[in-house]
Swiss-Prot record:
The lineage of its organism: Bacteria, Pseudomonadati, Pseudomonadota, Alphaproteobacteria, Hyphomicrobiales. This protein is located at the 30S-50S ribosomal subunit interface and may play a role in the structure and function of the aminoacyl-tRNA binding site. It comes from Allorhizobium ampelinum (strain ATCC BAA-846 / DSM 112012 / S4) (Agrobacterium vitis (strain S4)). GO terms for molecular function: structural constituent of ribosome. It holds the Pfam family Ribosomal_L19. PANTHER family: LARGE RIBOSOMAL SUBUNIT PROTEIN BL19M, RIBOSOMAL PROTEIN L19. One of its GO terms (cellular component) is cytosolic large ribosomal subunit. SUPFAM superfamilies: Translation proteins SH3-like domain. One of its GO terms (biological process) is translation. The keyword Ribonucleoprotein applies. PROSITE patterns: RIBOSOMAL_L19. InterPro entries: Ribosomal_bL19, Ribosomal_bL19_CS, Ribosomal_bL19_sf, Translation_prot_SH3-like_sf. This is Large ribosomal subunit protein bL19.
Amino acid sequence: MNIIQQLEAEQAATIEAKRTLPEFSPGDTLRVNVRVTEGNRTRVQAYEGVCIARSGGSINESFTVRKISYGEGVERVFPVYSPLVESVEVVRRGKVRRAKLYYLRDRRGKSARIVENTGTRARKLNDSERAALAEEKARLEAEKVAAAQALAAEKAAAEAAEKAAAAEAEAAKAAEGSAE
């Protein structure tokens, strides 16, 4: 493995550690959450459409999502490892026999529809994704609970220290009063 491939693999691993993308292919309907910066404000925008192509490899991999917005076809290319892509959610699995669905550009209405894939592989992928999402939610919930408990313990310790300091101050005052 040469140096460039090694660096690309390291970069891909660090990005995948931060967020994981589900397994998807052309024909699947995706909801891509993208970070958009307008002026000095940043927000997350959902872009939902059909994945019509995946191209490239390693760190240069990208996918094209097509949607119809107000009667106009809009295509957007997203790099898989872009930091602007917050998350990708598979809304529906499509059953197609091509890797590039560019023919959808010329189609309108029913002829542009993609049949939903209800095969066992798609079902397994959906189940595994649901399990992974549930696991992620449980992990985040556990982190929230642990943070809340740590905050409560910190507050209790601060209150106990405050009470101890107040008791010491009273004892000191009482000692001064009895010494007079």
